[in-house]
Regions:
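Feature recognizes metal-dependent phosphohydrolase scaffolds
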Residues: 1-255
Length: 255
């Protein structure tokens, strides 16, 4: 323009310098990020970052560097916060969900949770058990698993499910004001007949192999299960990235 006659040349020099210094890609990426930031003043996330699908830790890593956002907690987000705070029932539930949907990456790769003790326990306990009804739902899986690995995930799924039922019963007994007596499931099983009895109705069980359940005291953890719970608990409590991500969720809760 007549007011700033050198402006065009000035801009051309900037662009030429970006190109000659081989910073064109970096410049384009930076401009795209700037456009995103200016376009979205505040990002509102409608919960359940940790529900089923893979890569929850990747989303949280991205949010760590995001300028302005809030999270409307979903039940899965709250569950993970409970696990990160050391609640063993929540920990078992988180692992069970991961096994159910074949999503091990978030636990192992994302947060460094050691699942080897669970795998070893499951292989020993259910070595001759097909665990058919505990097959993972692969439509949400984070990888393509071979038959051997699928077999192992299935065994782990069954093992942690039984442990979860036992741990939940401890909480229900300790906090009767929750009114969750109906969620104590193992005591409703007639092990001799292989049926589940609820509100006067009987349901034939699709799986009757429960080697770690004592019918006389169904919620008592075996020594091996108790040791396993302690190892997994330690792993969750020592995951720095998990703590960081849960702290982020707490700080950025939506109003």
């Amino acid at each position: 323009s007549s007011i700033e006659p050198n402006k065009h040349a000035y801009i051309n020099v900037i662009i030429s310098t970006i190109i000659t210094t081989k910073r064109a890609d970096d410049f384009i990426i930076a401009m795209c990020n700037l456009i995103q930031r200016l376009t979205i003043d505040s990002l509102h996330i409608v919960g359940d970052i940790y529900d089923r699908g893979p890569g929850a830790h990747i989303i949280m890593d991205t949010l760590c560097n995001y300028h302005n956002f809030d999270i409307q907690w979903g039940n899965h987000d709250i569950l993970w916060m409970g696990a990160a705070s050391g609640n063993d029932s929540c920990i078992a539930n988180v692992i069970r969900m991961s096994m159910r949907y074949g999503n091990l990456g978030t636990l192992e790769d994302g947060y460094g949770i050691n699942l080897l003790p669970l795998a070893t326990f499951a292989m020993d306990t259910y070595a001759d058990d097909p665990c058919t009804i505990f097959m993972p739902k692969m439509n949400f899986a984070d990888a393509h698993y071979n038959e051997k690995t699928l077999r192992l995930i299935t065994q782990m799924h069954k093992a942690i499910t039984i442990i979860q039922f036992k741990l939940e019963a401890e909480i229900i007994d300790r906090r009767p004001e929750f009114g969750m007596e109906n969620r104590k499931l193992l005591e409703k099983i007639d092990f001799d007949r292989g049926v589940f009895v609820y509100e006067g109705k009987e349901y034939v069980l699709r799986d009757t192999n429960f080697p770690t359940v004592d019918p006389a005291n169904p919620y008592r953890l075996t020594e091996e299960e108790r040791e396993l719970v302690e190892k997994i608990h330690y792993s969750f409590m020592n995951s720095e990235k998990l703590k960081k991500h849960m702290r982020l969720s707490l700080i950025h809760i939506s109003e």
